[in-house]
Amino acid sequence: MGQKPIVVFPSDYFSSKTVDGEYMPERNAALGTGLFDCALFSYRKWEEQGILSLNFSGNTSGEEMSVPAIYRGWMMSPEKYCKFYMSLLQKGIRLITAPQEYKLAHYFPDAYPYLKADTAKITIYPLHSKINVEEIKKTFGRFMVKDYVKSVKGTKFPAFFDENTTQKQFDEAMKLFYSYRGDILSGGICVKQHFILKKYGQHSNEWRVFYAKGIPCEAMPNSEQPENAARPPQNLTEKYKNLPSPYYCLDYAELETGQWGILESGDGGVSGLPHGQDIPAYYRFLHKFLFANKV
């Protein structure tokens, strides 16, 4: 039997030999399947010094005979992920997601051309640029603001803006947005059409689907909705199984109209597993479709 594929996890910030607690259930599950080896990298050294210090007891043979791997961990900018990818490759570990594939799924505007038939319309702006709210209102009746990766929902920043929003109100709100995102701002500003979501009590009906080389994993509820909530249509989740990345996820939501739309895209390695996900089954799924070369 050949070398097992590797799952690369971040370490605890203060202990490079201990997996970050958030990912301990995943590491245990991955090892428990018997299908993967696991490697840790010092998250502190990586964040503070940009140095990849790897804790891995297995064998690698250098760049030419590199062992395939996936990353499961915290988000990185595309630039930092590229450095991470190359640093691992020099150590004989080849992440299955190349830097350009990571960026495509991680930055929503990059994924947008592949999703636009079933997602919110967007307009993008450079960070800290002046945004003319009157121009936006000509395109969108109701809209929200995020950077290329994240919104600041759950804060004092408005969940959406509409035709009554003045330029002054918008400018003041954007100051708040920048203060919340701080030094983790990503890419640029993305103004999105605001979807009105169907509610089941207090909860929307959102589902996350991971994809591995064109095969969708089981859709999992992702917004604490009740068990009787509708599931996303299979023809919709199948429609988006061929984005140009081997490992990504999409978030689907039921709209107030009863239709369905795509809320977000994400790189598979930095997207969290929904509560209730069968983690060992998830890792068996990844092994079968990412590494076993069979369907």
Where do the protein language model's features map onto the residues?
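Short amphipathic alpha-helical segments and helix-helix/interface helices
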Residues: E26-A30, Y81-M86, Y112, V133, ...
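Active-site nucleotide/adenylate-binding loops and adjacent lid/helix of ATP-dependent enzymes
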Residues: G2, V7-K17, E63, Y85-N205, ...
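Short acidic-glycine loop/turn motifs at beta-strand connectors
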Residues: Y211-I215, E256-G258
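A short glycine-rich, hydrophobically flanked beta-strand micro-motif that places a catalytic Asp/Glu
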Residues: I189-Q193, S245-E256
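ATP-binding N-terminal substructure of ATP-dependent carboxylate-amine bond-forming enzymes
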Residues: M1-R94, F291
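Protein kinase-like catalytic core scaffold
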Residues: F143, C217, Y248, G261-E264
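Short, surface-exposed coil-to-beta transition loops
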Residues: E79, K83, Q202-W207, Y247-Y248
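C-terminal active-site "lid" helix and adjoining low-complexity regulatory extension at the edge
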Residues: K241-S245, E254-V295
